Amino acid sequence: MSTAPAVTYDENSVPPISTVAGTGIAGFKGDGEAAATAQLNRPYGIVVDSTGTLYFSDFQNHRIRKITTDGKISTVAGTGVAGFGGDGGPAVSAQLNWPRELALDSEGALYVADGNNHRVRKITADGKISTVAGAGVAGFSGDGGPATAARLNVPMGVAVDSTGTLYVTEYHNNRVRKITTDGKISTVAGNGAAAFGGDGGPAVSAQLNRPHAVVVDGAGVLYIADGENHRIRKVAADGKISTVAGTGVAGFGGDGGPATSAQLHLPVGLVLDSAGNLYISEFRNHRIRKMTTDGKIGSVAGTGAAAFGGDGGPAAPAQLNHPFGLAVDCVDTLYIADYNNNRMRKIASARLAGLPESGAVVSWASVRSRLRMGVWRESTRDGAEVHQLLAAPRDHQRWRLVAAGQHNGDVLYRIENVRSGKVLEIAGAQQASGAVVAQRAYEGADAHHQQWRLIPVGPVAGASGVYEIANRHSGLLLRVDTNARTVIMQDGAEGDHRSRQWQLLPV
């Protein structure tokens, strides 16, 4: 069960930092158990899928692991033995060799920069692994031909755009290459020389110096962590390259001003949030910086000291130790691979101020009746009705709140029953008042009748943590009009306001 606090922080506080995985001891341990008690060994790349599951490369364990929304950790790829093998079979039985960054496509396939195998591997949603780029021999060759016959040289970063095109940075080739959906490979940035040059001209003629992460925005613009150039480079849709952050002088400085006038020190990780802000992890500055859409830069986490500290408080004075990969979820929670601390950290989203943290397990009490929301007869079947019931310390009355996205600036949740794993929905996706509430397996991001907005209403009759629960599809509120045990329905805002108010109680 999640140990997430019921409410992240209040509206007057700064988003806090916390640890989501790892004890700080380097090793391999904990699969099937709580991620917070697991051992990691140099976590590197990270990505979060649409359901809130977090995947990361456990670099020195030669594995890819995942953390589900209930806080449990497991291995999805790699045996722990460095090597190459297993293509065509289950990813958990395959060998990886110092895996780096990760990316996800729209079909849920996971791409792995399998660095010392000089390959990019793909893990499909059914858990099978294959090679999509690289012949396994370090070098540079193959442009214009099949990506699987090409030579790569320590692929580091991977990104997938909206069309399914895959981008790969190569550390020793000082290039960014792309693999189109027909499997062909080509170079999009870098001429192979480890240097700096070419801004304002074609990216393929420019020079990069040990590139790390790459990300791509919705318009097809690439951002590259140009590591030893201590810069962030941008490749526009027309193929022209420019610098968007960093002077090229290694160091720390420039917060509050233009990112192009700031000093960076070995930028390695990148991620874009939903507003287009770019987050940068700096390996040697032990910091996370943020470049806003107006080109200004600032620090969001880390003091510059290589250490561990600050959990539970604001991220800015917290300590990181050689941070690497970055990721954001659907509500812009920021995840950090805190490499030398052997931990996965997260910074709560500003959008969650005054709202429950994603992953929190709670019970819901009707303000009117004080009865608890629960699945009728503890059923685990699809379509089972949700009632208000006498309070009982059992899982059919416990609900996991998982962020499901944003709509018109509001955070949406799926409300998942702990016993059944099914989510709260309006039966039949009805929009009429009086429609009953039931549980059903989650149907994905387009299932608006299974997504909910929590509307804080403040303390009520001495009770804190009180919300109205509004369905995204219908816009109506969960409501009970009696103190008897009965089915919960959706309705409008008329009548006794207590009948549509629910108190969140931490479990």
Task: Name each model feature, range by range.
Residues Y9-R42, K72-W98, K128-V154, K184-R210, ...:
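Gly/Pro-rich loop segments of beta-rich domains
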Residues F59, G115, Y171, G227, ...:
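Short loop/turn segments immediately following the C-termini of beta-strands
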Residues V48-T51, L104-E107, V160-T163, V216-A219, ...:
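Residue-level detector of Asp-centered blade-edge/turn motifs that repeat once per structural unit
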Residues T53-Y55, L110-Y111, T165-Y167, L222-Y223, ...:
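Conserved beta-propeller blade signature
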